[in-house]
Amino acid sequence: MKQSKMLIPTLREMPSDAQVISHALMVRAGYVRQVSAGIYAYLPLANRTIEKFKTIMRQEFEKIGAVEMLAPALLTADLWRESGRYETYGEDLYKLKNRDQSDFILGPTHEETFTTLVRDAVKSYKQLPLNLYQIQSKYRDEKRPRNGLLRTREFIMKDGYSFHKDYEDLDVTYEDYRKAYEAIFTRAGLDFKGIIGDGGAMGGKDSQEFMAVTPNRTDLNRWLVLDKTIPSIDDIPEDVLEEIKVELSAWLVSGEDTIAYSTESSYAANLEMATNEYKPSTKAATFEEVTKVETPNCKSIDEVAGFLSIDENQTIKTLLFIADEQPVVALLVGNDQVNDVKLKNYLAADFLEPASEEQAKEIFGAGFGSLGPVNLPDSVKIIADRKVQDLANAVSGANQDGYHFTGVNPERDFTAEYVDIREVKEGEISPDGKGTLKFARGIEIGHIFKLGTRYSDSMGANILDENGRSNPIVMGCYGIGVSRILSAVIEQHARLFVNKTPKGAYRFAWGINFPEELAPFDVHLITVNVKDQESQDLTEKIEADLMLKGYEVLTDDRNERVGSKFSDSDLIGLPIRVTVGKKASEGIVEVKIKASGDTIEVHADNLIETLEILTKK
């Protein structure tokens, strides 16, 4: 493919509105352009990469018996009313009316549609299992689109749905998808973790998220690609290294989620779902009496602990939430933070939000900072973190502004349901007892769910079993964020290319090193002087030879300065660069392997053999 015929609008500078490196590079390198807030056009390079990723998915899904189809993006609201999600999904749902004033939506996901199609076609367990998927644009009216393709209003997604006679059958397909996802993301060249996740608005029970780990900005060996003029990082002057570090730190570490993972085992979970090892501790032998003490101007845990000269872990933090319009008290030890997702999941609540101070005063008779679990009305449900039950003679709010209780003991002074509702901290013991927890930022690229009968129950999708009894179909759901894969790959494969000029000055600039299976082309073939006939003839011969061997070639035939061509080549990020330059008359070309920065001169007749050796290496 001739570069002069492609739409690749590279920019000389990074876009000023980009905060993460993936967004900046995909715009600067000419992969995407924003059409309006949260809506992007995928230009030829991006489209080729996305199509290659689709090919990987199709190959892996065929291995597990998944069948591709296509459902409409424009959906009748009646289906979503039937499932109950039309009212509960929230403001992200695009709602519209046709000329007859009938309600429609633009699909953000397709559980209802697939459930209806199978409900109307499948009547017996003998017709199951079914494993269907589609690759399609989805729509969500994001309040604040940001970070390029990571948070958009229109996005490309692979969503799959499986239908089963029972949970044992679902378990088999769920495991098939887990392995398929691992194969897909490995082939895509991604550093990822499969982690325990939250089902969120999808409903259902078990779920696993797949997160692309966002690299930190401190490992220079990971970020820098050195030109052949620079032997090692140690040869770069200290002042230049400082400039490089400043440039690296200028970009936000991307990823909407925090991953908690073990340093010594396979345990990994979204921070929303992460837990730690818990071992009950021994309580004090004697219990003190509850005593009300004055604590003027003490509202935070630190202020109360300091005023009473006690350890903060001897205090009970009391928080008030409204869950489905009912008050719920959450108790934690000291400065532990509540994990809203754990609390919401335990309550099986559709809506959970922190109460206002006015609501707190109405229920407790006191404002924030003086709340406590003692003497609460029976109508108020108390959920306590499991660590709270180990406390003895603790301090809590007295439900009177400016006062606290000492000598508070769980069970004797209040009754609660004990469950893990705290947010874990880095350095705590992994729940399997192996290693400690470390945190990393991550980009969600895939999610698999065991939906169970959440949608078949509400939409009447039933089958007759072996005994002729009617049972709801058991479902699974499997999603991959196709367009955000491009962001995740660039986030992990962005590099700073460093070179030294003939005069000894150091230069560095951003570019991409695409993994082989996702690169829009395999080889970037650059002609230094397009006006030189020998160079042109050699370029055409090399292009033909490479294509004959199955290489996809982007030939830079533009009449541009060589520096501009090399700069664009680094930005575009193809794995191999072949340069036809000054030695074209001798049949000599330069080969550069982008991932390592290694370069070698070879005769054009030996190019194919050399590439096979270098790429295998």
Swiss-Prot record:
Q: Which UniProt keywords apply?
A: Aminoacyl-tRNA synthetase, ATP-binding, Cytoplasm, Ligase, Nucleotide-binding, Protein biosynthesis
Q: Does the keyword Chloroplast apply?
A: no
Q: What class of enzyme is it?
A: ligase
Cellular-component GO terms for this entry: cytosol
The record's InterPro entries line, in alphabetical order, gives: aa-tRNA-synt_IIb (IPR002314), aa-tRNA-synth_II (IPR006195), aa-tRNA-synth_II/BPL/LPL (IPR045864), Anticodon-bd (IPR004154), Anticodon-bd_dom_sf (IPR036621), Pro-tRNA-ligase_IIa (IPR002316), Pro-tRNA-synth_IIa_bac-type (IPR004500), Pro-tRNA-Synthase_IIa_type1 (IPR023717)
EC number, as in UniProt: 6.1.1.15
Q: One Pfam family, short name please?
A: tRNA-synt_2b
User: What's its catalytic activity?
Assistant: tRNA(Pro) + L-proline + ATP = L-prolyl-tRNA(Pro) + AMP + diphosphate
By its UniProt entry, which PROSITE patterns does this protein fall under? AA_TRNA_LIGASE_II (PS50862)
Is the keyword Lyase assigned to this protein? no
Give an example GO biological process: prolyl-tRNA aminoacylation
* Gene Ontology MF annotations: aminoacyl-tRNA deacylase activity; ATP binding; catalytic activity, acting on a protein; proline-tRNA ligase activity; transferase activity
Query: Where in the cell does this protein reside?
Result: Cytoplasm
According to its UniProt entry, what is the function of this protein?
A: Catalyzes the attachment of proline to tRNA(Pro) in a two-step reaction: proline is first activated by ATP to form Pro-AMP and then transferred to the acceptor end of tRNA(Pro). As ProRS can inadvertently accommodate and process non-cognate amino acids such as alanine and cysteine, to avoid such errors it has two additional distinct editing activities against alanine. One activity is designated as 'pretransfer' editing and involves the tRNA(Pro)-independent hydrolysis of activated Ala-AMP.
Q: Describe its assembly.
A: Homodimer.
* Family annotation (PANTHER family): MITOCHONDRIAL RIBOSOME PROTEIN L39/PROLYL-TRNA LIGASE FAMILY MEMBER (PTHR42753), PROLINE--TRNA LIGASE (PTHR42753:SF2)
Please give the record's comment on domains.
Answer: Consists of three domains: the N-terminal catalytic domain, the editing domain and the C-terminal anticodon-binding domain.
Q: Which family does it belong to?
A: Belongs to the class-II aminoacyl-tRNA synthetase family. ProS type 1 subfamily.
Protein's recorded name: Proline--tRNA ligase
Tell me what organism the protein belongs to. Streptococcus agalactiae serotype V (strain ATCC BAA-611 / 2603 V/R)
The primary gene name is proS
